[in-house]
Amino acid sequence: MKRFLMTLATALAVILPATPSPAAEHKILMLNYGKDGGMVFEPSYVKAEPGDTITFVPQNSSHYVQSYAVPEGVSPWKSKLDEAFTVTVEKEGVYLYYCPPHLMMAMIGIIQVGKPVNLEAVRQKAEKLRPKLVMKSERLETALGQVTPAQ
């Protein structure tokens, strides 16, 4: 009987699909001042998995979020001023976003979903953004530098 139960358990483990892990929820604060100085997203880098949700939460007035570079096939997104905004990230890749009123102060961030399949395309597009960053322009390279390579 014990052998039968062990065989049955093994067979079920092989046959039945693995239960997918529940999607994670990430919160990104939009701040006038944070640990990295003025006009920041906190955290400025999020590592997520496909299906996770990201909620941007303004903690001060005059902030909103807009995507700048997203994986191929993903629709760009833009929130309303001073309102929380949630996006579900379904495709692997790097998502670069910013706060339009504070772009010149390099209020930018990165979401990495799974493997960074579009990292080179994001880097190329980011170069076009660089001249608009009047202050704290190093934040762009710092954010991109946090992206972990595909494994």
Predicted region positions:
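Bacterial N-terminal signal peptides
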Residues: 7-17
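Extracytoplasmic copper-binding redox domains, predominantly the cupredoxin/blue-copper superfamily
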Residues: 21-151
